Amino acid sequence: MKIQGKMFIWLSVFILAVAVVYGYWSKEPAGTTALFLAFGLAIMIGFYLAFTARRVDAGAQDDMEADVADEAGEVGFFSPHSWQPLSLAVGGALAFLGIAVGWWVMYFSAPILMVGLFGWVFEYYRGENRTQ
């Protein structure tokens, strides 16, 4: 976390310099305000990471001699045979198409979205994949 903290603190210094130069040259308040807010966000994240790095044990990312495998852990669980993400993607595509074409397309996309969402959530609670 020390490296990430330093990275965000240096990023905030750069954003502050850009905000000052942009504000001086452009005289435009919206962009200048956005850059100063980005500076504030970066400095808050940087100091949070720096202070948190003091309280927790050093991770593999802080060791210069570390390998990639030192930080490796369980990635997570996924089901490669599932059709539910496809139905969710089709429902989402139809929903966004409904924004462009007409809101009436949402009537067709909402049931597909619900089937995909509930099917994906409850996939391992029914049928042959039931774990309990």
UniProtKB/Swiss-Prot annotation:
It is a multi-pass membrane protein. It is an enzyme of class 7 (translocase). Its EC number is 7.1.1.9. Part of cytochrome c oxidase, its function is unknown. Belongs to the cytochrome c oxidase bacterial subunit CtaF family. One of its GO terms (molecular function) is cytochrome-c oxidase activity. Pfam families: Cyt_c_ox_IV. GO terms for cellular component: plasma membrane. This is Probable cytochrome c oxidase polypeptide 4. Associates with subunits I, II and III to form cytochrome c oxidase.
